[in-house]
Design a protein with these regions (language model features):
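C-terminal alpha-helical cap/extension of soluble enzyme domains
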Residues: 155-218
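Glycine-rich phosphate-binding active-site loops on the catalytic face of alpha/beta enzymes
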Residues: 29-33, 112, 129-140, 183-202
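Conserved, mostly hydrophobic/aromatic
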Residues: 28, 86, 122, 178, ...
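A contiguous pocket-lining binding segment that forms or flanks enzyme active sites
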Residues: 111-165
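Alpha-helix-loop-beta-strand connector modules within alpha/beta enzyme cores
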Residues: 44-58, 95-108, 144-164, 207-218
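Active-site beta->alpha loop and helix N-cap motifs at the rims of alpha/beta catalytic domains
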Residues: 3-5, 9-13, 19-21, 27-100, ...
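Catalytic cores of alpha/beta
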Residues: 11-19, 69-73, 97, 115-125, ...
Length: 218
């Protein structure tokens, strides 16, 4: 499973990259606003900065909600950098845009996916990635991980090439559950990625090794 970091914070992206396990990054308008990045030109420059850090794909989300606007914005985003993936919502206009971009070899990430039906249409339209939102489904007492597993099963059964990118990951357990479900990618906050490293027995074992070494090398 690939690891993407879900943030627009350059410091966090660099920190994840330094671990040596980062495969890409995802952003959205809320994450850009959190970093106080305003205006189209500033956003576009920021996407390029992220691409200069991350060696894999970087999802940049468009703002338009109509088909024509999505096409205009998406073509601009795709031209910024070869590793930019155009991120767009799973709506009627979004599915039309995915089909349009697929015909032009522009890669897409169909986001805000909450049902198997949405995931099916995204794959049929030719999306590169589909992003089911695990945490947001859990928030309304639905099973986000079960949706990931269902999408994986359908895609494998029918041979769809669209990659399942598990999103809205809240904690390390979500990552492990999505791994078990067969997700191709999990996009996570830095804290969740770092959480995979932590285990009390690792800490206590290292402490004992160091103490024993110090005792024998006084």
């Amino acid at each position: 499973m690939k690891f993407f970091i879900d943030t627009a914070n350059l410091e966090q992206i660099r920190k994840a990259h330094e671990l040596g396990v980062l495969d890409g990054a995802t952003t959205n308008p809320s994450l850009m606003a959190k970093e106080n990045i305003r205006g189209t030109e500033n956003c576009n420059r920021h996407y390029v900065e992220i691409c200069n850090i991350v060696e894999g794909d970087v999802s940049a989300e468009l703002i338009a909600t109509d088909f024509e606007g999505m096409v205009r914005e998406g073509e601009v985003l795709a031209a910024l950098h070869p590793r930019i993936v155009v991120k767009l919502p799973c709506t009627a206009a979004g599915i039309r845009a995915v089909k349009y971009f697929a015909a032009k070899d522009i890669r897409t990430n169909c986001t805000l996916v909450f049902s198997i039906g949405q995931a099916l249409l995204a794959a049929k339209a030719g999306a590169t990635y589909v992003s089911p939102f695990v945490g947001r489904l859990d928030d309304i007492s639905e099973d986000g991980v079960a949706l990931v597993a269902h999408i994986v099963k359908v895609y494998r059964t029918y041979g769809y090439k669209t990659q399942v990118l598990a999103a809205s990951i809240r904690h390390t357990q979500h990552i492990i559950q999505c791994l078990d479900a067969g997700a191709d990618v999990a996009t996570c906050p830095l804290a969740a990625i770092e959480g995979l490293l932590r285990h009390p027995l690792t800490d206590s074992g290292l402490e004992k090794f160091l103490a024993d070494h110090a005792r024998l090398n006084v």
